[in-house]
């Protein structure tokens, strides 16, 4: 039996969920086709709006950097919408996540620094409030004595490496940074198998099997005279309640730093967005994968998925939020890069020819890779094109869109939410005209 919705969204990451939430709030019936974990489950817990220009110049605020971005990279999705539109959507997203209680700090008006797990300082827009952050203009970090606590036998977080790198920054040269390990004998079973000694498994054991008082005492003892305590993000799988309780009971200034994936901070954020979408009445088709579409008269009529290969899924509008190569939203064959479901028109930047594989990569591994700027081409309404013609009811949001390198510029999350909210607005407007 065929299913029909107002809107079908392909992809359950930040872009797909943001778009779905906005549409559900407006009374639309949405379904998200979700194939596996999203990139949020591997993220740092911070969201970037714009951190750097293509010429390498660091950005303090989006408003300050926009004109240079437009001059240097006119194909960037932000430049299709204009400065004021991007700022408006960034503000709208901040209001949305405040309502959801996503536990983040930051503002679209000004970037801030977050401390990275390797002891770096990264410019970003929004950060989970459990992560150590500081204002861009602060000369010194707010505490002089920092203790970095690891977990004995846990190699996805290296306290000594973090401490040695952090002290190199001018903002931390006044700090005394010490390191120590939590022993936690309750984790001995996990230590026997390194594959199982990951943040998710640690969190599950700590929440459900550990005597809480003993954990509090061990953290207090290992912290010494530290004024700020940095911990690996292994304390609270589904939400931040367990970590907040630890902070309260220890009486210490505890901070979490994301570990190697999976990232508990990203998992928590993804779960909150997903739960809110479902609370609004949205449907999530988990473990399913969109395979192909039927397009007639420049409109998508239906799509077929791995679990619905005989009966299509119908909708008035479709949103492609399937992510980039990491999520298989984009794929490569020998002679070209393509989007596999609709095979729509692609775009890159000046360094890449989509149909010439010799231009897809840079010689230096650590250099920005041209293929990372490849993606689908959109117009100012986030609509897609096929053979140069607009598909009227097909929109794109997030990292599946091309024309920019999200890793190089630090703008992946910003593009995701701005395009998601823009697509939602245009879908609502189109349905209201009918």
Swiss-Prot record:
It comes from the Bacteria. Its cofactor is FMN. Pathway: Polyol metabolism; glycerol degradation via glycerol kinase pathway; glycerone phosphate from sn-glycerol 3-phosphate (anaerobic route): step 1/1. GO terms for molecular function: glycerol-3-phosphate dehydrogenase (quinone) activity. It catalyses: a quinone + sn-glycerol 3-phosphate = dihydroxyacetone phosphate + a quinol. GO terms for biological process: glycerol catabolic process. Keywords: Flavoprotein, FMN, Oxidoreductase. One of its GO terms (cellular component) is glycerol-3-phosphate dehydrogenase (FAD) complex. It is an enzyme of class 1 (oxidoreductase). InterPro entries: FAD-dep_OxRdtase_2_FAD-bd (IPR003953), FAD-oxidoreductase_2 (IPR050315), FAD/NAD-bd_sf (IPR036188), G3P_DH_GlpB_su (IPR009158). HAMAP family: Glycerol3P_GlpB. Belongs to the anaerobic G-3-P dehydrogenase subunit B family. Conversion of glycerol 3-phosphate to dihydroxyacetone. Uses fumarate or nitrate as electron acceptor. Composed of a catalytic GlpA/B dimer and of membrane bound GlpC. This is Anaerobic glycerol-3-phosphate dehydrogenase subunit B. It comes from Histophilus somni (strain 2336).
């Amino acid at each position: 039996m065929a299913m029909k919705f107002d809107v079908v969204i392909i992809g359950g990451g930040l872009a797909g969920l943001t778009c779905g939430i906005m549409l559900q709030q407006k009374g639309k019936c949405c379904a998200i086709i979700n194939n596996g974990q999203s990139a949020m489950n591997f993220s740092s817990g911070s969201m970037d709006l714009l951190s750097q220009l293509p010429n390498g110049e660091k950005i303090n605020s989006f408003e300050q950097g926009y004109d240079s971005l437009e001059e240097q990279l006119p194909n960037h999705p932000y430049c299709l919408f204009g400065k004021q539109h991007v700022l408006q959507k960034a503000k709208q997203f901040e209001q949305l996540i405040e309502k959801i209680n996503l536990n983040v700090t930051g503002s679209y008006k000004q970037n801030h620094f977050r401390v990275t797990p390797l002891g770096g300082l990264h410019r970003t827009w929004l950060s989970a409030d459990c992560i150590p952050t500081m204002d861009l203009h602060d000369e010194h970090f707010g505490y002089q004595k920092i203790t970095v606590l690891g977990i004995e036998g846990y190699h996805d977080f290296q306290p000594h490496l973090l401490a040695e790198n952090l002290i190199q920054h001018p903002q931390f040269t006044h700090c005394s940074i010490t390191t120590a390990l939590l022993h936690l004998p309750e984790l001995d079973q996990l230590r026997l198998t390194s594959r199982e000694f990951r943040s998710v498994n640690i969190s599950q054991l700590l929440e459900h099997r550990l005597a809480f008082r003993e954990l509090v005492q061990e953290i207090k003892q290992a912290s010494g005279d530290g004024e700020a305590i940095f911990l690996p993000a292994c304390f609270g799988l589904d939400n931040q309640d367990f970590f907040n309780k630890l902070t309260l009971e220890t009486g210490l200034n505890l901070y979490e730093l994301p570990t190697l994936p999976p990232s508990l901070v990203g998992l928590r954020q993804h779960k909150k967005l997903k739960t809110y979408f479902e609370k609004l009445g949205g449907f999530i088709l988990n473990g399913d994968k969109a395979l192909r579409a039927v397009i007639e008269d420049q409109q998508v009529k239906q799509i077929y998925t791995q679990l619905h290969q005989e009966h299509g899924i119908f909708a008035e509008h479709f949103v492609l939020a399937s992510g980039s190569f990491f999520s298989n939203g984009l794929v490569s064959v020998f002679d070209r890069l393509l989007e596999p479901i609709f095979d729509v028109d692609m775009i890159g930047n000046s360094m890449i020819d989509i149909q010439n594989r010799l231009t897809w990569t840079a010689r230096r591994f650590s250099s920005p890779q041209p293929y990372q700027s490849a993606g689908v081409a959109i117009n100012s309404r986030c609509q897609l094109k096929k053979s140069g013609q607009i598909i009227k009811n097909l929109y794109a949001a997030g990292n599946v869109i091309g024309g920019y390198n999200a890793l190089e510029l630090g703008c992946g999350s910003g593009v995701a939410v701005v395009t998601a909210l823009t697509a939602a607005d245009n879908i609502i407007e189109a349905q209201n005209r009918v």
